[in-house]
């Protein structure tokens, strides 16, 4: 039977529940257990797909086309299990499901209430995410509850997991609570009172934590941990210090050395081999011992919040490790880039233009793509980054004056990028939309395969077929492809059903490394394997750097 670990948070948000949950899952997986993770988000949005990146950060897309919380990206990078739609749900989804059941008459005329109907629905969703009662059932499901204890929004979730723990019976569930222990500089000490209070709030709800993870900017001394233990009704050996580290890949070892996985296995009566964290140790060693540095610039619309590009940042770092270098990423707001100042990009070894929505900052991205093309700087455009590269090429090489996307200029005489009206979804179903369709849930989403043209840079990287995850509404307009090809643009991958453009590039005889992809390869990168596209991109940046040094040496 599947056992559950419920992870809650207190005092403040953004303490790292996702990293803590993923790290615990990684340790349990190293013990030979089949593990999955589920994220419960207490907001009323059906999913984060229409939320601003400045508010929510990145929207992580699963293979089956779910737009989910960025924590699912952490989960996939830490464990072998691939996340699905069932691994993330929101209050909006819960209420939507409950109201649909009420309309169908499923409740047989009863008054529909938060308890038991909403709480039962939450429990059903959690079990579905764990594959409960199916051949896909896991040994342990780690359930992360978003928000903080004390929030009104979180109460139905906390009540649901309290009830679920009771129904599961002894030794089938455990509670891990993450709290904050601030360092007060004026007093010169760590303060445990916030953690004492949040543990008390949790008990008032009816939940007793089995382990407390105490976040601080430094290791918490034994005396403070004993004090927390006394006032939180948690054994001192279950009060675990979680301090700031220079890489998140140190966290599994940190938690293991303090016995968190042993505590959980004892609580759940799980008999397993010892944890084997060698690959984590090797990973940390690799990050700490680079053989060089490479500098890339990301020209984006949401650079004020680095979480907006979380998976992309990680994918670049993974590729750096595979090339044995440390990648330094500079972020430049595309709104600030103009033809007059675009030469500031010359100091970088490569240029990356990520995805985005809306017209703001687009001309700056087009300037960046033009600079990379004309100055033979390695360029990788992702989603919108591929589209702006296509627009730039159309304007300045193919002679299509005023070329644009219908997203930015619906009346453009040369709409080289246009709205997709029909496509095959990740589940194989045919989807349609038009300009009047809702924004939410109407994009081309999830993993889809494309055929790669032989003799191209894309084929060197991917081989015959590329399967990547998508999240977009607009595509290269098929009516302009012949014109673009004749001007020298290489269309190196097409979708298998609709023959939509998936990858564009320049011939290596013209540019050493210039590529735009319509999909989001960052969602498939892991610290163990990296990702072939990003590995090739960083290698190109290194080659560009070496060529620049050689020119300076000659001069």
Curated annotation (Swiss-Prot):
Keywords linked to the UniProt accession: ATP-binding, Glutamine amidotransferase, Ligase, Magnesium, Metal-binding, Nucleotide-binding, Pyrimidine biosynthesis
A Pfam family that the UniProt record links to this protein: GATase
Domain Glutamine amidotransferase type-1: 295-547
Positions with a binding annotation for UTP: 13, 191-196, 227
A Gene Ontology biological process term: pyrimidine nucleobase biosynthetic process
InterPro entries hit by this protein: Class_I_gatase-like (IPR029062), CTP_synthase (IPR004468), CTP_synthase_N (IPR017456), GATASE (IPR017926), GATase1_CTP_Synthase (IPR033828), P-loop_NTPase (IPR027417)
EC number from the UniProt entry: 6.3.4.2
Residues involved in L-glutamine binding: 356, 384-387, 407, 473
Catalysis: reaction(s): UTP + L-glutamine + ATP + H2O = CTP + L-glutamate + ADP + phosphate + 2 H(+); L-glutamine + H2O = L-glutamate + NH4(+); UTP + NH4(+) + ATP = CTP + ADP + phosphate + 2 H(+)
Positions that bind ATP: 14-19, 71
The UniProt record lists the keyword Transferase: no
Binding site for CTP: 13, 151-153, 191-196, 227
Amidoligase domain: annotated segments: 1-270
Location of the active site: 383 (nucleophile), 520, 522
Activity regulation, free text: Allosterically activated by GTP, when glutamine is the substrate; GTP has no effect on the reaction when ammonia is the substrate. The allosteric effector GTP functions by stabilizing the protein conformation that binds the tetrahedral intermediate(s) formed during glutamine hydrolysis. Inhibited by the product CTP, via allosteric rather than competitive inhibition.
Known function: Catalyzes the ATP-dependent amination of UTP to CTP with either L-glutamine or ammonia as the source of nitrogen. Regulates intracellular CTP levels through interactions with the four ribonucleotide triphosphates.
Record's subunit section: Homotetramer.
Family as reported in the entry's similarity comment: Belongs to the CTP synthase family.
NCBIfam families: PRK05380.1, PyrG
Protein name: CTP synthase
Species classification: Bacteria, Pseudomonadati, Pseudomonadota, Betaproteobacteria, Burkholderiales
Gene that encodes it: pyrG
């Amino acid at each position: 039977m599947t056992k559950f670990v419920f992870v809650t948070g207190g005092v403040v948000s953004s303490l790292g529940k996702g990293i803590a949950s993923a790290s615990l899952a990684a340790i349990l997986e190293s013990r030979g257990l089949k593990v999955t993770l589920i994220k419960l988000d207490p907001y009323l949005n059906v999913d984060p797909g229409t939320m601003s990146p400045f508010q929510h950060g990145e929207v992580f897309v699963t293979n089956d086309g779910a737009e989910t919380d960025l924590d699912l990206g952490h989960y996939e990078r830490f464990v072998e299990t691939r996340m699905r739609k069932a691994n993330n749900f929101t209050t909006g989804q819960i209420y939507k499901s409950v109201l649909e059941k009420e309309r169908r008459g499923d409740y047989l005329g009863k008054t529909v209430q938060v308890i038991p109907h909403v709480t039962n629905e939450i429990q059903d969703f959690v079990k579905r995410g764990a594959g409960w009662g199916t051949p896909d059932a896991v040994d342990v499901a780690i359930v992360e509850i978003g928000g903080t204890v004390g929030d009104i929004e979180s109460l139905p979730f906390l009540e649901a997991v309290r009830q679920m723990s009771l129904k599961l019976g002894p030794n089938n569930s455990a509670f891990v609570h993450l709290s904050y222990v601030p360092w007060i500089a004026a007093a010169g000490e760590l303060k445990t009172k916030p953690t004492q209070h949040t543990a008390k709030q949790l008990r008032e709800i009816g939940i007793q934590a089995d382990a407390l993870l105490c976040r601080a900017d430094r290791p918490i001394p034994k005396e403070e941990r004993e004090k927390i233990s006394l006032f939180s009704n948690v054994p001192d050996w279950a009060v675990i210090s979680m301090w700031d580290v220079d890489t998140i890949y140190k966290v599994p070892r940190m938690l293991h050395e303090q016995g968190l996985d042993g505590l959980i296995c004892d609580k759940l009566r799980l008999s397993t081999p010892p944890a084997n964290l060698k690959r984590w140790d090797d990973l940390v060693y690799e990050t700490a011992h680079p053989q060089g540095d490479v500098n890339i610039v990301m020209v984006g619309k949401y650079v004020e919040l680095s979480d907006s590009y979380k998976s992309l940042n990680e994918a670049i770092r993974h590729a750096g490790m595979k090339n044995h270098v440390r990648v330094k990423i500079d972020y430049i707001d595309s709104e600030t880039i103009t033809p007059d100042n675009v030469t500031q990009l010359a100091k970088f070894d490569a240029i990356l233009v990520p995805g985005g929505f809306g017209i703001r900052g687009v001309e700056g991205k087009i300037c960046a793509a033009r600079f990379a093309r004309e100055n033979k700087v390695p360029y990788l455009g992702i989603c919108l980054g591929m589209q702006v590269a296509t627009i730039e090429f159309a304007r300045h090489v193919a002679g299509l004056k005023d070329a644009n996307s219908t997203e930015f200029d619906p009346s453009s005489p040369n709409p080289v990028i246009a709205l997709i009206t029909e496509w095959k979804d990740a589940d194989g179903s045919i989807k349609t939309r038009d300009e009047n369709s809702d924004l939410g849930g109407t994009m081309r989403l999830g993993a889809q395969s494309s055929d790669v043209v032989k003799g191209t840079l894309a084929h060197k990287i991917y081989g015959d077929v590329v399967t990547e995850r998508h999240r977009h509404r607009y595509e290269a307009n098929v009516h302009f492809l012949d014109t673009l090809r004749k001007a020298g643009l290489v269309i190196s991958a097409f979708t298998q059903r609709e023959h939509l453009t998936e990858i564009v590039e320049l011939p290596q005889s013209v540019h050493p490394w210039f590529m735009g992809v319509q999909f989001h390869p960052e969602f498939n990168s892991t610290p163990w394997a990296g990702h072939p596209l990003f590995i090739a991109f960083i290698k190109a940046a290194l080659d560009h750097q070496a060529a620049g040094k050689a020119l300076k040496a000659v001069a």
